[in-house]
Amino acid sequence: MAIGVVKRNAGSSSDGTEDSDFSTDLEHTDSSESDGTSRRSARVTRSSARLSQSSQDSSPVRNLPSFGTEEPAYSTRRVTRSQQQPTPVTPKKYPLRQTRSSGSETEQVVDFSDRETKNTADHDESPPRTPTGNAPSSESDIDISSPNVSHDESIAKDMSLKDSGSDLSHRPKRRRFHESYNFNMKCPTPGCNSLGHLTGKHERHFSISGCPLYHNLSADECKVRAQSRDKQIEERMLSHRQDDNNRHATRHQAPTERQLRYKEKVAELRKKRNSGLSKEQKEKYMEHRQTYGNTREPLLENLTSEYDLDLFRRAQARASEDLEKLRLQGQITEGSNMIKTIAFGRYELDTWYHSPYPEEYARLGRLYMCEFCLKYMKSQTILRRHMAKCVWKHPPGDEIYRKGSISVFEVDGKKNKIYCQNLCLLAKLFLDHKTLYYDVEPFLFYVMTEADNTGCHLIGYFSKEKNSFLNYNVSCILTMPQYMRQGYGKMLIDFSYLLSKVEEKVGSPERPLSDLGLISYRSYWKEVLLRYLHNFQGKEISIKEISQETAVNPVDIVSTLQALQMLKYWKGKHLVLKRQDLIDEWIAKEAKRSNSNKTMDPSCLKWTPPKGT
């Protein structure tokens, strides 16, 4: 592509006129934007006329070589009214028609300024001229003729785009992480090609949570299940719209006919649960485990009812969808500094959340921890050497409760600061809403342990403020994952209310509660209320009396009664219904676990409320 350019003589402007004449045409100070536009139009017209006139006078014309073979040399010239106070002006872009050697025309964009014009240089390699006759001395005076590497690279990219006949405005935008995170990534499951998704809504996946192969499914099966789930959701939404009486308030809490039918249906489905696995099924499951190990999900068929298994599958798909949304938003990054596992005693625990351990420990991915003093270390060798000389066999503080092998220690955050800080960092690995890490001095920690011949092993703990303005009896509560679903969480809750009874106070846990914490507390409140109603023989009952006897906050009592549909409003009064079916169900459960020692005995508590702390 060749461009015709008028040769510039020394001491003249680009249009062949003298510098003084052209600078007079360019003078404009303190004028409005509209005046500036009209003047620019006039200057372009005069320049075109002079260019035509100079062409008629047989001015010499040079042809530049094609952009594809050699890069054209540009020179820039700045003409101002005053040499002492140059005023920079933002360049404006104008489309120009340039003719290729082949005869085709394409639009290119060239920058023009109110005070700048771009010309092609002669064969000489002299520096660009300025009003003072010297090369520019500051970065603000340097234009495209400045020889730097970044500029050369940008010119080369522009030339390649011009050769292809594409517009610079069509250049692809830079992708952000959430738009390009999946490039050069693949699923970590062995043998998986990253196709499909557990939710059935995505074509690819890059994590185990969305891998169909890990969940022993195919991509087509996931799509079929997604369609079935969407259909069920639509039917449920339609039933809610048609149900005008679906209100859960104090005045109307009776379940609707549709809800009762659904409850009966669920009860029938759960009765179809198989009593146990056959010998062939056990062999099949063991073979699957030996073949794939931890790279595949265990086979779950026939372990529970079809309804519960389908409910679990839907929960898995929903969790995978939420994780995919977070990953697309950039909130989940690969290789983030998060501890994946911890070696704690004879257990290896997978962590759930991020904990603010020091950077040199957080980036390891695997942390080694002493189960007695809770000191964290980087390697197995350091842990082995530490255990050889660690003299701790139980938590610090005072042992205030012991029954059998279960003990509870009261640890003051002010006296044992390091231990309590390590305990909080450990708890954050399994709690989402925990914010207390280092400021432990205003808190008391009650640590529950189980003793054997090697020492007192940590089961869980709860903390509470020494002086709580709102009478919170629990600030944070945790049961270690290896002891979950064994009744220890309810024992910790019961022990916190036992301390409130000794203090003669009404207590309540600090909000917000975690998901597992809320489930545990609702179960405990339900059990307390049903036990109280079972032993109550009067005709009139008071929420205040229940609160004083059980140390449970009245707000928690009312919310539990509403959840059990035992609180009604009739003839201007609130009534508490004594539902015998719920009480009988609770009695049957108590009879099954009567031999269990997972209860707190008030006679084993040796403790007096602290004063002046």
Curated annotation (Swiss-Prot):
Example of a GO cellular component annotation carried by this entry: chromosome, centromeric region
Top-level class of the enzyme under EC nomenclature: transferase
Gene Ontology BP, a term: DNA repair
Subcellular location: Nucleus; Chromosome; Chromosome, Centromere; Cytoplasm, Cytosol
Regulation: Histone acetyltransferase activity is inhibited by GMNN in the context of a complex with CDT1, inhibiting histone H4 acetylation and DNA replication licensing.
Domain notes: The C2HC MYST-type zinc finger is required for interaction with MCM2 and ORC1.
Self-association state and partner proteins as the record states: Component of the HBO1 complex composed of KAT7/HBO1, MEAF6, ING4 or ING5, and one scaffold subunit: complexes containing BRPF scaffold (BRPF1, BRD1/BRPF2 or BRPF3) direct KAT7/HBO1 specificity towards H3K14ac, while complexes containing JADE scaffold (JADE1, JADE2 and JADE3) mediate acetylation of histone H4. Interacts with MCM2 and ORC1. Interacts with the androgen receptor (AR) in the presence of dihydrotestosterone. Interacts with CDT1. Interacts with MAP2K1 and CUL1. Interacts with p53/TP53; leading to inhibit histone acetyltransferase activity.
Descriptive protein name: Histone acetyltransferase KAT7
Species classification: Eukaryota, Metazoa, Chordata, Craniata, Vertebrata
Gene: Kat7
